[in-house]
Amino acid sequence: MLSPVTPGELLKEEFLVPMGISQYRLAKETGIPAQRIGQIILGRRRVTADTDLRLCRYFGLTDGYWLRAQIAFDLEAEKRRIEPELDKIVPVQRAIAL
């Protein structure tokens, strides 16, 4: 099973590399600290609302694009982590029918 894609991987592989944009340039042109961008790309920091709005404006995306990517990553990672516990939960409708 493939690991979920972090927003940082998405940023680097789908935006920065193909567009030839450096992390330094992104930082300078968006006002996002370079250290924050680096940490997001390495998967050591989550995307915040501030970062989302700045990246969305810069890349011409709908507000929330990066936050949705962060939430999708978080949900998939957590689901994998607690899958055995989730498998033990009986949905309420099935529990009532039993």
Question: Where do the language-model regions lie?
Answer:
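Short, basic-rich loop-to-helix N-cap that marks the start of a DNA-contacting helix
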Residues: 44-57
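A short, Lys/Arg-rich alpha-helix, primarily the initiator
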Residues: 1-21, 68
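The DNA-recognition helices of helix-turn-helix-type DNA-binding domains
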Residues: 33, 44, 73
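The alpha-helix within a helix-turn-helix
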Residues: 16, 27, 56
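Short, charged recognition helix plus adjacent turn
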Residues: 68-98
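Short alpha-helical DNA-recognition segment
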Residues: 20-39
